[in-house]
Amino acid sequence: MLKKDMNIADYDPQLFAAIEDETRRQEEHIELIASENYCSPRVIEAQGTQLTNKYAEGYPGKRYYGGCEHVDIVEELAISRAKELFGATYANVQPHSGSQANAAVFMALLQGGDTVLGMSLAHGGHLTHGSHVSFSGKLYNAVQYGIDETTGQIDYAEVERLAVEHKPKMIIAGFSAYSGIIDWGKFREIADKVGAYLFVDMAHVAGLVAAGIYPNPMPHAHVVTTTTHKTLAGPRGGLILSSINDEDIYKKLNSAVFPGGQGGPLMHVIAAKAVAFKEALDPEFTTYQEQVVVNAKAMARTFIERGYNVVSGGTDNHLFLLDLISKDITGKDADAALGNANITVNKNSVPNDPRSPFVTSGLRIGSPAITRRGFGEEESVQLTHWMCDVLDDISDLAVSERVKGQVLELCAKFPVYG
């Protein structure tokens, strides 16, 4: 018999302790991983509802199970809000992740062995953009473009040259570690020149796009995907969008998600997506995203003032790469040193990195999470100075301890969930 007062703390104290420790870590550590954020209590509430009990294979009005009349409403809300948010005429809210959304696009538009052109992982792309360790590089003929070593920006001339030479069936625009603004229109021009689909993965900038402070790829791309966390600050999940008004492609995309790549959708997560999309339609969300960019720019500028090398010389979005080659510090060691001071980052390869991806020569730094907990430009600059203090001599444990104390004070002033 199930009772409403059942809880994890009494039944599984070992698991409960781990959950409590992670909750404490999030409150007492400053989060600078660009792909992480804090979702609202409303999003968390949706994921903990009885919707998790319901199997709903298929799509609203076309389910393979009975009893779906209420979850149909949930999914339709998520779909309509996603369309409104991004100016789309098609939305599939069922992908469990961004990678699964991307896999569905490949399955819908390509045949195995077809040529795709995407950004190299080493230059800021994503695993699913053609990396040899991913399905995108194993099942398809992947050609990779990069950035201009001098400017740190995408080399559109190289993209066009590679497209003309290799005649890809699909060109991928998007990134996981790129601080510039992508010219979606230029990518579409190149795609049209060689008769390719343009597929945009805007996972990292979807929140900025929704707020209208980063160019919307929807008018240019055949298909757009995103995660629903990161800058969107929703639950972990994926989303596929389009505005080309091609019902044949829409059907192929739906079939590629279900039954092509997934079975039953996670209705409790789809409910959380619906909540997050509604939150993103609120004017306050635009204010938040504007501050995200202000904070990222302030941090990049401060690192440069302290003598550190920022790839491309700054940022125009929510993230930037810190190149530590000239400091003779590995990304792995920098990550660990900052972690000891309760500052969470992730090691990241920089362009033409001489070190392995398991060590790296850089850090990827993002501002969505710190902005979500209330940090402004002043706090962002102060935080950057603390980080530089640690990185100036990562062996100085006294500095790490001092910074840790300052971090704890700042976190107490700006709780994640106040």
From Swiss-Prot:
| Cofactor(s) required, per the database record | pyridoxal 5'-phosphate
* Pathway stated in the Swiss-Prot or TrEMBL entry: One-carbon metabolism; tetrahydrofolate interconversion; Amino-acid biosynthesis; glycine biosynthesis; glycine from L-serine: step 1/1
Q: Quote the EC number.
A: 2.1.2.1
Instruction: Give the catalytic activity.
Output: (6R)-5,10-methylene-5,6,7,8-tetrahydrofolate + glycine + H2O = (6S)-5,6,7,8-tetrahydrofolate + L-serine
What is a GO molecular function of this protein?
A: glycine hydroxymethyltransferase activity
Question: For (6S)-5,6,7,8-tetrahydrofolate, which residues are the binding ones?
Answer: 121, 125-127, 356-358
Please, one GO biological process term?
Answer: glycine biosynthetic process from serine
Residues with PTM N6-(pyridoxal phosphate)lysine: 230
Alphabetical keyword list: Amino-acid biosynthesis, Cytoplasm, One-carbon metabolism, Pyridoxal phosphate, Transferase
Q: Which GO terms of the cellular component aspect does the record hold? A: cytosol
Localization of this protein? Cytoplasm
Q: Where is this site: Plays an important role in substrate specificity?
A: 229
Q: What does this protein do?
A: Catalyzes the reversible interconversion of serine and glycine with tetrahydrofolate (THF) serving as the one-carbon carrier. This reaction serves as the major source of one-carbon groups required for the biosynthesis of purines, thymidylate, methionine, and other important biomolecules. Also exhibits THF-independent aldolase activity toward beta-hydroxyamino acids, producing glycine and aldehydes, via a retro-aldol mechanism.
Which HAMAP family would you find in this protein's record?
Answer: SHMT
Q: Which family does it belong to?
A: Belongs to the SHMT family.
UniProt subunit comment: Homodimer.
User: Which NCBIfam families does the protein's record reference?
Assistant: PRK00011.1
**What is the name attached to this protein's record?**
Serine hydroxymethyltransferase
